């Protein structure tokens, strides 16, 4: 964050700064730290020693460009070279070489990595910080039991608890408990040292009986007792060196390593002065923790809040990459040690070059980026999605929580989240509260804590100083929240201001304030900060809006929002989709795919993105915004990207909306739209789909790409070139051949022609035939071929498959079934497209574009859409754009309503349109029915809100099937569009059919159309040749499955025919 000339003004930090800082910290410090841990490796005879020289490592510039790595499915990485030495102790000679130890994936300008052609991003993880935490729980008798939990750097736990008799026990990983004296003795302390280093020696002596004295009589006895309890072994184990090593490895090294963060936290909590480089648990730590636990028992000290952010740490991209690099070096160490032993055994002369291989490092990073839960494919639906994805925080992942076991208390909002984690932006569903988003100004500190900035208020100095505070520090300050000074420092300070102190919200005098906020919505994430009038919305609807903005599809003709918040420009710039001038100069040439400009004494060519596919099949494209001969300055926008206009984020369109019912077509949030949105391409978007095919070498020979495909119609092959690949610019429909391919296979003996049999009998020649395995365009894939990539793997091996990728562009207008949404959680499905002349129209004759259901506003409590709607109408008439800061009620009561009404009044005056602002019902207007011309009975709210078209489109979801695959067990249709699934009539579907009075079709629904194998085959044949469909005689497969399952429970199910006569006789006898 940079300060300007005015010391109270500052810029918002770059939104992708979290990723860049983390990766730079890994390159600058993480690599050196892990390389310095690499040990010296000796052979068994200690004649040869191998070591790495950390000071001289280097990363080489990548050999390929980012764009080529994406198209050719390669990894954009850098080669790591380190100096290594091989020392011959007997000869006192050293051989030093610079060796290549592997590739490290690099981070590009978007803050992402390209691995195997995919943009991947590593999100940060929230973990419980290592240290000690005290809490109180009630036992089954309702008595408080105090416990202290020591959490290691790897997540292992050691619990200390004090019972009703003030006896202290240690419990390792919830196993059997042992006395604190036994644990301390096993760690090397005798009874005298224990009593000298505790504050309450009399309590320790109180539960020291003869049995306990025997256990701690010597270190060996204590270790045996501890090993017996820790490993849960029976009998009487015998003390030995191997037992000590096992205990040292399993417990003291794995479960007692605190790390630097844990050592720092433990020193602060227990008032210790142990050096921070001593990262293992010591006897002093155990005894100090026990002292504090005794103090809690007698009412001294405070308990810890486990959900406070001061007790959490952020595992950033730097930490995750450093852990993987350390794991790779451990594997490399084992490999080098085995290679040295093998070379000595076979009497070979090793060199540093042939001792080291790049496989451990390269495979470790590829496995991490491909399989780790925190490494995700970058969501590139729109620019906002890209930038928000890298700012996510997750409680999930290795060492963290799971969605099914996390409690409500962990998911809830905590006061320490203020300015650090957004209280609104989280995922919906099972992971709610477990995946959050960083606030705008939050940053990750050196110790893994989340920091947020404040302005310090000092009476002695008039200068304003900015401080970044961790969650443990801002508890001791009175922090003024939401004061008007955050935007306008000229306003006189109020006498009474709201403030936050020690996790409580108070109202105090201004003289008592220590710190104040620097931004009106610094506690929100990017997604929530883009919602205008967010203070008038329910938090649940704001959450939905934050998520739905990330699902907006870039439109072919984007438009800036009339009502915004002011962050749209920075989001667009930091997302990297726009081309920005790095220095000043003059434009020499510009066209659709490049910009050439000169400056600083040289000429530079900037390629523009043209029809690039995102992983959500949206179209990424850049459009030049400068002209030839124009002079530009540093930081100026050269080309707009997808969903940006003039360097600002533009996700949707400002359309004319009326809130009114219309013939039931907006029932349950459905949306009625005008055909103008189709004919004028208002909500038209381009989508690019990728289809690929591989050629392999089979046992009968290699597969061939060719345009000579036998037994196929000529119309299906008309778009192929001489190589058998579809031509650029071709228009293709469903079923067309994109790539012609023949797979060789051996023909059956009966299918040989007589001459083939003669050749085979005389010369032994095997006659092969080919099977057509072409790449065909699937259902719903019509469009224009915009790109074809034929990727041939380097090396010339015939076993490396060739990959052919065909990219097809689709133009999609808005249609019935598409999902649209506003920025206030108001979402709906398009239910009907009306002609323009039938839509309701205003008093100036203009028909509205959309009709929303007014019942969706009061119950959802998202009134912000009404403010935006009316202010947007005023802005469109006055040709103005508004940037509204949230929580403007702090300046004046009813500030939002006064602003909207004043703008509407001014618009009605300037345009001489009194219907824009009518004092009887301000914000509403009388509109007319397009079908009859009669006015509606009630005035209607009309306006111009910003409406988005979401990626949930009917073209991707609609699905039909006549026959297809069936489940093997139940013989019922599979589920899902991807599997060509069908409908499964279950219990509730049967109830629905019965309830609607169509029970007579249940038999065919449950037999022919479901799981009666023979009946559905007969139906298919009868339908083709004509005739009467036979009735099924036996039971369907699901009933057979029920019978088998009952038999597995030793229950036999039989059926008998009972006549009515016998039934009556049996009743009389009874």
Swiss-Prot record:
UniProt xrefs under InterPro entries: DNA-dir_RNA_pol_bsu_ext_1_sf, DNA-dir_RNA_pol_su2, DNA-dir_RNAP_su2_dom, DNA-dir_RNAP_su2_hyb_sf, RNA_pol_bsu_bac, RNA_pol_bsu_CS, RNA_pol_Rpb2_2, RNA_pol_Rpb2_2_sf
Entry GO MF terms: DNA binding; DNA-directed RNA polymerase activity; ribonucleoside binding
EC number: 2.7.7.6
Keywords from the UniProt entry: Chloroplast, DNA-directed RNA polymerase, Nucleotidyltransferase, Plastid, Transcription, Transferase
Superkingdom to which the source organism belongs: Eukaryota
Any one GO biological process: DNA-templated transcription
GO cellular component, one term: chloroplast
Compartments in which it is found: Plastid, Chloroplast
UniProt xrefs under PANTHER family: DNA-DIRECTED RNA POLYMERASE I SUBUNIT 2
Function statement: DNA-dependent RNA polymerase catalyzes the transcription of DNA into RNA using the four ribonucleoside triphosphates as substrates.
Subunit structure: In plastids the minimal PEP RNA polymerase catalytic core is composed of four subunits: alpha, beta, beta', and beta''. When a (nuclear-encoded) sigma factor is associated with the core the holoenzyme is formed, which can initiate transcription.
Full protein name: DNA-directed RNA polymerase subunit beta
Natural source organism: Cucumis sativus
Taxon lineage: Eukaryota, Viridiplantae, Streptophyta, Embryophyta, Tracheophyta
């Amino acid at each position: 964050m940079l300060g300007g000339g005015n010391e109270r003004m500052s810029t918002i930090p770059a939104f992708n700064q979290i990723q860049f800082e983390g990766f730079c910290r890994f390159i600058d410090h993480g690599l050196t730290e892990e390389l310095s841990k690499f040990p010296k490796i000796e052979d068994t005879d200690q004649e040869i020693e191998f070591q790495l020289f950390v000071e001289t490592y280097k990363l080489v510039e990548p050999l390929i460009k980012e764009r080529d790595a994406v198209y050719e499915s390669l990894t954009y990485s850098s080669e790591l070279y380190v100096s290594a030495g091989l020392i011959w102790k007997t000869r006192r000679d050293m051989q030093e070489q610079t060796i290549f130890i592997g590739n490290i994936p690099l981070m590009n300008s978007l803050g992402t990595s390209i691995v195997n052609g995919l943009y991947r991003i590593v999100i940060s993880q929230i973990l419980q910080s290592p240290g000690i935490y005290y809490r109180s729980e009630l036992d089954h008798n309702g008595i408080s039991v105090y416990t202290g939990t020591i959490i290691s750097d790897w997540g292992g736990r050691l619990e200390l608890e004090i019972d009703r008799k003030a006896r202290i026990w240690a419990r390792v990983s919830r196993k059997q408990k042992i006395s604190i004296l036994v644990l301390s003795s096993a760690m090397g302390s005798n009874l005298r040292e224990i009593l000298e280093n505790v504050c309450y020696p009399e309590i320790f002596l109180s539960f020291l009986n003869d049995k306990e004295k025997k256990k701690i009589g010597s270190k060996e006895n204590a270790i045996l007792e501890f090993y017996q309890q820790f490993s849960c072994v029976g009998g009487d184990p015998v003390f030995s060196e191997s037992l000590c090593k096992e205990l040292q490895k399993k417990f003291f090294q794995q479960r007692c390593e605190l790390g630097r963060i844990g050592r720092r936290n433990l020193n602060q909590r227990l008032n210790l002065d142990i050096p921070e480089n001593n990262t293992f648990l010591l006897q002093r730590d155990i005894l100090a923790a026990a002292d504090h636990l005794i103090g809690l028992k007698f009412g001294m000290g405070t308990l810890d809040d486990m959900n406070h952010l001061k007790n959490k740490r952020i595992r950033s991209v730097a930490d995750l990459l450093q852990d993987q690099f350390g794991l790779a070096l451990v594997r490399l160490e084992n490999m080098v040690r085995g290679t040295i032993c093998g070379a000595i055994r076979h009497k070979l002369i090793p060199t540093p070059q042939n001792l080291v291989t790049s496989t451990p490092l390269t495979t470790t990073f590829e496995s991490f980026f491909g399989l780790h839960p925190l490494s995700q494919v970058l969501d590139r639906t729109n620019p906002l999605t890209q930038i928000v994805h890298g700012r996510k925080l997750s409680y999930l992942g290795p060492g963290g929580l799971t969605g099914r076991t996390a409690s409500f208390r962990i998911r809830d909002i905590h006061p320490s989240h203020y300015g650090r984690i957004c209280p609104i932006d989280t995922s919906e569903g099972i992971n709610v509260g477990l995946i959050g988003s960083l606030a705008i100004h939050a940053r990750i500190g050196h110790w893994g804590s989340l920091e947020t900035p404040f302005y310090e208020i000092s009476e002695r100095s008039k200068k304003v100083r900015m401080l970044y505070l961790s969650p443990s520090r801002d508890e001791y300050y009175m922090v003024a929240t939401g004061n008007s000074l955050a935007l306008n420092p000229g306003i006189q300070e109020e006498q009474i201001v709201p403030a936050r102190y020690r996790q409580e919200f108070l109202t105090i005098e201004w003289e008592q304030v220590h710190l104040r906020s620097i931004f009106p919505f610094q506690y929100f994430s990017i997604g929530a900060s883009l919602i205008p009038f967010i203070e008038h919305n329910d938090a649940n609807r704001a959450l939905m809006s934050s998520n739905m903005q990330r699902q907006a599809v870039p439109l072919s003709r984007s438009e800036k929002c009339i009502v915004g918040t002011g962050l749209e420009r920075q989001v667009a710039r930091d997302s990297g989709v726009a081309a920005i001038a790095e220095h000043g100069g003059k434009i020499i040439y510009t066209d659709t795919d490049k910009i050439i400009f000169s400056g600083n004494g040289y000429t530079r060519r900037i390629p523009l993105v043209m029809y690039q596919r995102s992983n959500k099949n949206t179209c990424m494209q850049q459009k030049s915004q400068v002209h030839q001969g124009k002079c530009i300055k540093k930081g100026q926008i050269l080309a707009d990207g997808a969903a940006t206009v003039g360097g600002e984020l533009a996700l949707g369109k400002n359309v004319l909306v009326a809130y009114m019912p219309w013939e039931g077509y907006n029932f349950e949030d459905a949306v009625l739209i005008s055909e103008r949105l189709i004919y004028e391409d208002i909500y038209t978007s381009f989508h690019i789909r990728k289809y690929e095919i591989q050629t392999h070498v089979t046992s009968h020979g290699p597969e061939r790409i060719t345009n000579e495909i036998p037994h196929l119609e000529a119309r299906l092959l008309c778009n192929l070139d001489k190589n058998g690949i579809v031509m650029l610019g071709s228009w293709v429909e469903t079923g067309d051949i994109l790539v012609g391919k023949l797979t060789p296979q051996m023909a059956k003996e009966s299918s040989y022609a007589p001459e083939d049999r003669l050749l085979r009998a005389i010369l032994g020649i095997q006659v092969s035939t080919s099977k057509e395995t072409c790449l065909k365009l699937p259902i719903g894939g019509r469009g224009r071929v915009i790109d074809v990539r034929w990727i041939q793997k380097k090396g010339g091996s015939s076993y490396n498959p060739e990959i052919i990728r065909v990219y097809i562009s689709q133009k999609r207008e808005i249609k019935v079934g598409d999902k649209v949404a506003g920025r206030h959680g108001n979402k709906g499905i398009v239910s009907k497209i009306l002609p323009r002349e039938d839509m309701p129209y205003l008093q100036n004759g203009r028909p509205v574009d959309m009709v929303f259901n007014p019942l969706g506003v009061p119950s959802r409590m998202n009134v912000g859409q009404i403010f935006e709607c009316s202010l947007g109408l005023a802005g469109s008439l006055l040709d103005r754009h508004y940037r509204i800061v949230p929580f403007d009620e702090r300046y004046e009561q009813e500030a939002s309503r006064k602003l909207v009404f004043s703008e509407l009044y001014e618009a009605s005056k300037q345009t001489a349109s009194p219907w824009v602002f009518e004092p009887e019902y301000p914000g509403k207007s009388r509109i007319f029915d397009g079908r009859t011309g009669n006015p509606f009975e009630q005035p209607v709210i009309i306006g111009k809100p910003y409406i988005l078209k979401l990626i949930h489109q009917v073209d991707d979801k609609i699905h039909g099937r006549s026959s297809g695959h069936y489940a093997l067990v139940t013989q019922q249709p599979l589920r899902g569009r991807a599997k060509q699934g069908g409908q499964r009539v279950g219990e509730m579907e049967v109830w629905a059919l019965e309830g609607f009075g169509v029970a007579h079709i249940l038999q065919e629904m449950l037999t022919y159309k479901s799981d009666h194998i023979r009946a559905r085959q007969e139906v298919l044949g009868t339908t083709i040749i004509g005739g009467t469909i036979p009735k099924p005689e036996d039971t369907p497969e699901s009933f057979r499955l029920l019978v088998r399952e009952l038999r597995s429970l030793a229950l036999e199910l039989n059926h008998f025919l009972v006549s009515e006569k016998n039934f009556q006789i049996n009743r009389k006898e009874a």
